[in-house]
Structure formats: C-alpha cells, structure tokens
Swiss-Prot record:
Coiled coil: none annotated. One of its GO terms (molecular function) is ATP phosphoribosyltransferase activity. It comes from the Eukaryota. Belongs to the ATP phosphoribosyltransferase family. Keywords: Amino-acid biosynthesis, ATP-binding, Cytoplasm, Glycosyltransferase, Histidine biosynthesis, Nucleotide-binding, Transferase. Pathway: Amino-acid biosynthesis; L-histidine biosynthesis; L-histidine from 5-phospho-alpha-D-ribose 1-diphosphate: step 1/9. GO terms for biological process: L-histidine biosynthetic process. GO terms for cellular component: cytoplasm. It comes from Eremothecium gossypii (strain ATCC 10895 / CBS 109.51 / FGSC 9923 / NRRL Y-1056) (Yeast). Catalyzes the condensation of ATP and 5-phosphoribose 1-diphosphate to form N'-(5'-phosphoribosyl)-ATP (PR-ATP). Has a crucial role in the pathway because the rate of histidine biosynthesis seems to be controlled primarily by regulation of the enzymatic activity. Its main location: cytoplasm. It is found in: Cytoplasm. This is ATP phosphoribosyltransferase.
Length: 297
C-alpha cells in the first residue's frame, strides 16, 4: 500500500518489461537522469532522481495503458500502437527498435506478390494490421474479405512449414530468423520503431511532462552529435566555418596571437570522419572531438 500511495504525485511512465526494447529504454532513461532501482519481484519502480514512477509492462499492453490515461507516458513500437487501435500521441521517434512488419512466404514457393495471397490463410500476432492490409488488397471491407487471418502468439515463422498457413505477417529486423525458416518477404505492412508516446488525457502536470520529454530529446540529440574544436588562422577561417557551421552558429574565440582563432562547433556524428578530413585539408590545426553525454537543443 505504501508503494501505491507514492504513485499519486508521480508521472507514470510505462516501459517495456523485457527484451531489447527494455534494455534500450533503460539506457535512455539513465541518460536522461531518470534513475531507479527495480526489485526483481515488482513491475513498478520509483525514480530516485525525479518524481516519476516506472511501470514495466509487455510492449503490446503499453498503448492501452497510456491511451486510457492509466499511464502518462510510454515507450513502445509504432506497430503495437497501430495494432492496439488506441488513441495516443506519438511524441518522439527514439531511433531504436527499427524493423519491418512484413508478409513472408516460403522461399521458392508459388507466391511472389502479396495479391496472390488473397483468399489464402495468413498467420500472425498482428491480426488488426494484417486484416487491414489484406482488406485493402482485396478492395473490400474487412467483413467481406476472403483472406483468412489467424492469430498465433509466438513462433509465427513455423506456421508455413507446419502447414498452418500459406504466409505469415511478422516483425523482421535483420531477416536472419526468417531466412533460417526458409521464408522470404514479398510485402511490407508497416515500418516501425520505438517511440515515446503520451496519453491524450495525462494526469501528470504538463510542466513535468515537458521536462521528461526535453531530457529524452537531449539524450537523442547527444547521440547524433559530437563536439569539435580546432584552431584556425584568420586567412583560413571563412573556409573552415563553412565546414563546421554548427547547429546555429560556431563559437569563435580570439587567441593571444592576433592571427589565430579557436573554433568550437557541434557536428553530426556520422559525418565526423569526413569533416575532420576536410578541416585538416583546409588548414585547421589542433583538431579535437569530444563526446556529448547530454544536451538541450
């Protein structure tokens, strides 16, 4: 009862309780300084650094808890949001958990286009999305479609080999599992990734919601950028600033030598190698790059 009473004044944040989404979500929360200790026997953890309570749930249940206002925020995949049919706000793409919800058929079999599966049997754990997809292919309402969609909760990739289905609809990340099962993709139902979602009727204060969102955005921005500094002669400065314009503008400081300047700028992480090469070729000296652990942009 003490734990339940402590939830009253906290923002309730639904987080996947296991798997890769759990691991990535916890790393994101730690980066945002939403620190907590979770007992192995409990699916609720109180943050020790912020007025937030973390509620650990199956990823498929999170849209319902958030959509009905039982939790204020949540982390789950767009696939789970669309499958649930619940009204939630997609606040932020978290840039992990990227995969495709694909139509897969036995490799070398008679099917090469999803239209060839009209009237056949499809097995999936995403029945809502599969029905919508095949109803569009047939050009009819779901009630009138001839394609049969059956629910299976796990090991969907085995359905074709066991003769349960002509095709499956399942999430695919690298495709290795499907290839090992002798399956090949012939259509994509949905591209998905983990998102920060918000209830349409949050009970927590808007100020706290905005603070948590800003912290998470800061962690994501820090993952995309690094901090670059270098020294530049006045003659080379204009060309160098074109290479490192910064998010808004670079920071330029005059050195004791009248002809030299120190320049600092955020640069895109994935372009770091090219930018450093260009800086060196254009006359920059003493070039250094630093990691950014967090920021507000």
């Amino acid at each position: 009862m003490d734990l339940v009473r402590q939830l009253n004044d906290r923002l309730l944040f639904a987080v996947p309780k296991k798997g890769r989404l759990y691991e990535k979500s916890v790393a994101l929360l730690n980066g945002a300084d939403i620190l907590f200790h979770r007992s192995h026997r409990l699916d609720i953890a109180l943050s020790t650094s912020t007025p937030v309570a973390l509620i650990f749930l199956p990823a498929a249940d999170i849209p319902t808890f958030v959509g009905e206002g039982r939790c204020d925020l949540g982390i789950t995949g767009v696939d789970q949001v669309r499958e649930s049919g619940v009204n939630v706000e997609l606040l932020q793409d978290l840039d992990f958990g990227r995969c495709q919800l694909q139509v897969q058929v036995p490799a070398g079999g008679p099917y090469s286009q999803p239209e060839q599966l009209i009237g056949k049997t499809i097995v999936t754990s995403f029945t809502r999305l599969a029905r919508e997809y095949f109803a569009r292919l047939e050009g009819v309402d779901e009630a009138a479609m001839t394609t049969r969609v059956k629910y299976v909760g796990g090991s969907v990739e085995a359905a074709c080999a066991l003769g349960v289905a002509d095709a499956i609809v399942d999430l695919v990340e690298s495709g290795e599992t499907m290839r090992a099962a002798g399956l090949t993709p012939i259509g994509t139902v949905l591209s998905t990734s983990a998102h920060l979602i918000c209830s349409p009727n949050p009970k927590s204060s808007l100020a706290l919601l905005d603070t948590v969102r800003a912290r998470i955005e800061g962690v994501l921005a820090a993952q995309h950028y690094v901090y670059c500094t270098y020294n530049a002669h006045a003659d080379a400065l204009p060309a160098l600033l074109r290479i490192t314009p910064g998010r808004r503008a670079p920071t330029i400081s005059k050195l004791d030598d009248d002809n030299w300047y120190a320049v600092s700028s955020m640069i895109i992480r994935r372009e770091k190698g090219r930018i450093l090469d260009d800086l060196k070729a254009s006359g920059a000296e003493d070039i250094m790059v630093f990691e950014i652990s967090n920021c507000r942009v």
